[in-house]
Amino acid sequence: MVATVKRTIRIKTQQHILPEVPPVENFPVRQWSIEIVLLDDEGKEIPATIFDKVIYHLHPTFANPNRTFTDPPFRIEEQGWGGFPLDISVFLLEKAGERKIPHDLNFLQESYEVEHVIQIPLNKPLLTEELAKSGSTEETTANTGTIGKRRTTTNTTAEPKAKRAKTGSASTVKGSVDLEKLAFGLTKLNEDDLVGVVQMVTDNKTPEMNVTNNVEEGEFIIDLYSLPEGLLKSLWDYVKKNTE
């Protein structure tokens, strides 16, 4: 198994009203921006040079809704009258993988920050070199219930007998996602793609989510109905992409 380390990225959002622009449907038009930074081992912001590019998947009403940026801080600026949930795809250097992060663009505050912990492989020389700028590149010690025991297995940890994603959900729809179809799609993924599912769920785990990592049985059990709509949509997009 490939050794990994954890890093924390910070998504920074700012917005303000544009008083000179006429309102739309009685809502003021705002200028907003999002940028991404990395936190070092002291919690200080540094450029996120571990990423090759970042793609913001905006609301489809925007022209060219998938916006790509290749230079830190991967800042996007736009105007609009309403907030919306979006996905942000961050791509690690040397094609070491994509992480899709749900983000809520809202206008409750003029500025706010959200942090996400992601797992990063240590098998790419340039990526490891950039990782060293933010902290240790020693393999992360896994905690019970995290993806670490799947992706950072060492000689002191037994290899799981099999890697399976179990789903516990009724036949129902949440938001725009049919949970029954999602559950069926998960069963069609190969082992490598299932690792991506585990990564996405673990990176975005909250206390409200009912997720169990049964290491001894090699199972990662997900109650789909407990997942937020943004994450469910990301999982559905991932399943469709990897099963079509």
From Swiss-Prot:
Keyword Lipid metabolism included in the entry's annotation: no
Record-marked site positions (Acylated histone binding): D104
Main location: nucleus
GO biological process terms on file: chromatin remodeling; DNA repair; DNA-templated transcription; positive regulation of transcription by RNA polymerase II; regulation of DNA-templated transcription; regulation of transcription by RNA polymerase II; RNA polymerase II preinitiation complex assembly; transcription by RNA polymerase II
Localization (cell): Nucleus
Boundaries of every YEATS domain copy: 1-134
Cross-link position per record: Glycyl lysine isopeptide (Lys-Gly) (interchain with G-Cter in ubiquitin): K181
Record key words, sorted: Isopeptide bond, Nucleus, Transcription, Transcription regulation, Ubl conjugation
Quaternary context: The 1.2 MDa TFIID complex is composed of TATA binding protein (TBP) and the 14 TBP-associated factors. One copy of each TAF1, TAF2, TAF3, TAF7, TAF8, TAF11, TAF13, two copies of each TAF4, TAF5, TAF6, TAF9, TAF10, TAF12, and three copies of TAF14. TFIIF is composed of three different subunits: TFG1/RAP74, TFG2/RAP30 and TAF14. Component of the SWI/SNF global transcription activator complex.
Task of the protein: Functions as a component of the DNA-binding general transcription factor complex TFIID, the RNA polymerase II associated general transcription factor complex TFIIF, and the chromatin-remodeling complex SWI/SNF. Binding of TFIID to a promoter (with or without TATA element) is the initial step in preinitiation complex (PIC) formation.
Family listed: Belongs to the TAF14 family.
Name by which UniProt lists this protein: Transcription initiation factor TFIID subunit 14
Source organism (scientific name): Saccharomyces cerevisiae (strain ATCC 204508 / S288c) (Baker's yeast)
